[in-house]
């Protein structure tokens, strides 16, 4: 029902600081940890494609963020594709290096989902919810220190981690999905299908709700 702007600095591929791996192309043959089906999985697929590699050129290690962090710290994997705040926590702990972020990978931002029958019956309310989320994000940025303190307490993380997390987030206005975002997400769906990660092709346009009362770009 809605989408955030991309946050290319908030998702990365990490390697140990002293790793000989200096480029995505050099991940060939190496173990890379990430959560299957996640945005980090998408980041990795796009980075490999950009570097001229196939998914089969690496050794994927499917792990939750907590387990991936442990495996990475213990040297059981060679690289780790991950998002914030896990990325910020690892970065501030030290001994890691960013191999690649999403700056030039044309990813979408996070999506907000709703049951289609509900959205179709309550379009005005859905738009109000998206606007409220956007206002909350603006408040988080305008009252930065209060937000850092509150989020650190709520998420159980140190304040410097939250500060880094916020630094990686551009201002976020959440809006209904338009044609350009749908096209980018279609690329992701096709990429997952081409790598046999989903069983059949997905037409993203059929999965997107648009408010009928809002004029705009058609999918």
Question: What name fits each language-model region?
Answer:
Residues 60-61, 66-153:
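Pocket-lining segment of extracytoplasmic ligand-binding domains
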Residues 1-54, 59-62, 78-81, 99, ...:
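Short, glycine-/small- and polar/acidic-enriched structural segments
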Residues 190-219:
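Conserved C-terminal helix/tail region of periplasmic/extracytoplasmic solute-binding proteins
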Residues 51-53, 93-94, 155, 195-196:
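Residues at alpha-helix termini
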């Amino acid at each position: 029902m809605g989408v955030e702007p991309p946050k290319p600095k908030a998702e990365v591929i990490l390697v140990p600081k002293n790793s000989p791996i200096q480029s995505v192309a050099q991940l060939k043959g190496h173990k890379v940890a990430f959560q299957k089906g996640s945005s980090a999985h998408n980041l990795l697929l796009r980075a490999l494609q950009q570097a001229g590699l196939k998914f089969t050129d690496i050794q994927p290690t499917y792990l939750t963020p907590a387990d991936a962090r442990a495996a990475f710290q213990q040297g059981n994997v060679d690289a780790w594709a991950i998002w914030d705040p896990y990325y910020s926590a690892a970065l501030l702990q030290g001994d890691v290096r960013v191999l690649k972020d999403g700056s030039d990978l044309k990813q979408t931002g996070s999506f907000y989902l709703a049951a289609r029958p509900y959205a179709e019956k309550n379009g005005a309310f859905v738009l109000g919810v998206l606007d409220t989320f956007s206002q909350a994000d603006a408040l988080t940025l305008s009252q930065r220190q209060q937000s850092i303190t509150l989020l650190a307490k709520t998420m159980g993380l140190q304040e410097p981690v939250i500060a880094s997390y916020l630094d990686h987030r551009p201002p976020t206005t959440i809006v209904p999905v338009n044609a350009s975002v749908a096209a980018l997400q279609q690329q992701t769906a096709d990429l997952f299908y081409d790598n046999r990660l989903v069983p059949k092709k997905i037409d993203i346009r059929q999965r997107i709700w648009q408010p009928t009362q809002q004029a705009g770009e058609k999918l």
